[in-house]
């Protein structure tokens, strides 16, 4: 959420930042609403002040036995009682209109973010490792997985498209990957493990930016009785399945003031995630690349404004370390202004090399690490008390550390062997009971 005072003070800078995002200038429209809002609030406050003053004057007039003046003042107060609800309603309506408009505007990019329209304008930052050479043509994970316990047919019977059932060694390997990531972040990177709810309220979804703009991308759960309730009640009482643990973890500080000494607050969770993928029709229809349900390790940091940029670099390094320990080839790119997420000021994507994808392999996203400034904090009313005693908005950051399903794909395709089995990376073998190969009989 944007600060209207900042827009009021720097309308040209605000519009310039929106233009970098590929949006039209909005400051004039917002400031016009703000002017109406401020005028309505002023009128309401003046009416309230006059009513209070007139009430005091009535007592003074009666004390002075000036019945004529007392009667006139009582008539004035009666009129104010009639008009005040209308003025208060107008002020509330203008306030809600401004909040509604502001809530639909994405975060503004930092100055160092490269300008661009889409993923083609993203900038490569660095590369780790190199592509492996194989004595055979590498296969895609879904071709390898059929014999190893990857079952899309059964999943379709249970839930429809974009779901998978994993069995035997593959189920164990996916669990091992998630546990390895969680252990790395909690024992070496200083994150606190959290096991959050998977169902959250509307205001929680709003806080991190999923609502109102991305309502159609969410899965919603409702109690049976609400299915026959009026739409307004259904919408108010529904719960959203988290599209990422970022939603729950970040909102742990909503509507609170934390002590500066508690920052940075670093949280991590391994959870299922649920996405409707409303805009992904026809994309990645094969395999596990794009699923309605997937597992992910999420990293969230709550910081002061002065430390958020450094924390962003630290978070990226933590996510990278996962892939380095797995010895996977990857690259880091800085997203351009036209490709960033709604709540982000700046985003790094980590793309892992998958040798079985496309024609000869491809880089695919496995992690996004974003700094959001105070954008989410304003939506959540999340603040910290600085050393001077004044409450200020925190800065929030989030990143995948990493997507477990896509890490499984990368391990399968990178460590595949000519006989169709998968060599288990050294770092995962302790989580696999010492198993070194996932084969059809594993």
UniProtKB/Swiss-Prot annotation:
Nucleotide-binding as UniProt keyword: yes
GO molecular function terms attached to this record: ATP binding; serine-tRNA ligase activity
Main location group: cytoplasm
Top-level taxon in the UniProt lineage: Bacteria
Catalysis performed (reactions): tRNA(Ser) + L-serine + ATP = L-seryl-tRNA(Ser) + AMP + diphosphate + H(+); tRNA(Sec) + L-serine + ATP = L-seryl-tRNA(Sec) + AMP + diphosphate + H(+)
Residue positions binding ATP: 275-277, 365-368
CDD domains reported for this sequence: SerRS_core
Keywords: Aminoacyl-tRNA synthetase, ATP-binding, Cytoplasm, Ligase, Nucleotide-binding, Protein biosynthesis
PROSITE patterns: AA_TRNA_LIGASE_II
GO CC annotations on file: cytoplasm
Gene Ontology biological process terms in this record: selenocysteine biosynthetic process; seryl-tRNA aminoacylation
Residues the entry annotates as binding L-serine: 244-246, 298, 400
Localization (cell): Cytoplasm
InterPro entries from the UniProt entry: aa-tRNA-synt_IIb, aa-tRNA-synth_II, aa-tRNA-synth_II/BPL/LPL, Ser-tRNA-ligase_type_1, Ser-tRNA-synth_1_N, SerRS_1_N_sf, SerRS_core, tRNA-bd_arm
PANTHER family: SERINE--TRNA LIGASE, SERYL-TRNA SYNTHETASE
Domain commentary: Consists of two distinct domains, a catalytic core and a N-terminal extension that is involved in tRNA binding.
Function: Catalyzes the attachment of serine to tRNA(Ser). Is also able to aminoacylate tRNA(Sec) with serine, to form the misacylated tRNA L-seryl-tRNA(Sec), which will be further converted into selenocysteinyl-tRNA(Sec).
Similarity comment text for this entry: Belongs to the class-II aminoacyl-tRNA synthetase family. Type-1 seryl-tRNA synthetase subfamily.
Protein name: Serine--tRNA ligase
Natural source organism: Bradyrhizobium sp. (strain ORS 278)
């Amino acid at each position: 959420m944007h600060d209207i005072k900042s827009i009021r003070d720097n309308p040209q800078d605000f519009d310039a930042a929106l233009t970098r995002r590929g949006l039209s200038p909005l400051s004039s429209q917002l400031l016009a609403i703000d002017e109406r809002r401020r005028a309505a609030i002023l009128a309401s406050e003046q009416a309230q002040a006059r009513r209070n003053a007139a009430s005091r004057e009535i007592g003074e007039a009666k004390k002075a036995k000036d019945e004529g003046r007392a009667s006139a003042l009582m008539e004035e107060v009666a009129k104010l009682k009639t008009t005040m609800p209308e003025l208060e309603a107008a002020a509330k309506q203008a306030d809600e209109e401004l909040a509604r408009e502001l809530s639909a505007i994405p975060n503004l990019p930092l100055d160092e973010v490269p300008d661009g329209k889409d993923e083609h304008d993203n900038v490569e930052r660095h590369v780790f490792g190199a592509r492996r050479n194989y004595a055979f043509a590498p296969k895609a994970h879904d071709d390898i997985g059929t014999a190893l316990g990857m079952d899309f047919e059964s999943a379709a019977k249970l839930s429809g498209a974009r779901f998978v059932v994993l069995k035997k060694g593959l189920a164990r390997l996916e669990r091992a990957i998630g546990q390895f990531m969680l252990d790395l972040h909690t024992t070496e990177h200083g994150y606190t493990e959290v096991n959050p709810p998977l169902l959250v309220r509307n205001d929680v979804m709003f806080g991190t930016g999923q609502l109102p703009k991305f309502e159609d991308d969410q899965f919603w759960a409702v109690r049976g009785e609400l299915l026959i309730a009026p739409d307004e009640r259904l919408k108010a009482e529904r719960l959203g399945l988290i599209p990422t643990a970022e939603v729950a973890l970040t909102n742990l500080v909503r509507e609170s003031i934390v002590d500066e000494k508690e920052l940075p607050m670093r949280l991590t969770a391994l959870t299922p995630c649920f996405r409707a993928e409303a805009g992904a029709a026809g994309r990645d229809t094969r395999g596990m690349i794009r699923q309605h349900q997937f597992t992910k390790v999420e990293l969230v940091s709550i910081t002061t404004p002065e430390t958020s940029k450094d924390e962003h670099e630290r978070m990226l390094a933590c996510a990278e370390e996962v892939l380095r320990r797995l010895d996977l080839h990857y690259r880091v790119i800085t997203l351009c202004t036209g490709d960033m997420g709604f709540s982000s000021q700046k985003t790094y994507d980590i793309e892992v090399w998958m040798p079985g994808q496309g024609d000869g392999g491809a880089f695919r996203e496995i992690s996004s690490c974003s700094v959001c400034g105070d954008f989410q904090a304003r939506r959540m009313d999340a603040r910290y008390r600085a050393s001077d005693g004044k409450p200020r908005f925190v800065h929030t950051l989030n990143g995948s550390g990493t997507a477990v399903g896509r890490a499984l794909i990368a391990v399968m395709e990178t460590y595949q062997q000519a006989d169709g089995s998968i060599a288990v990376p050294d770092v995962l073998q302790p989580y696999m009971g010492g198993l070194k190969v996932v084969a059809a009989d594993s």
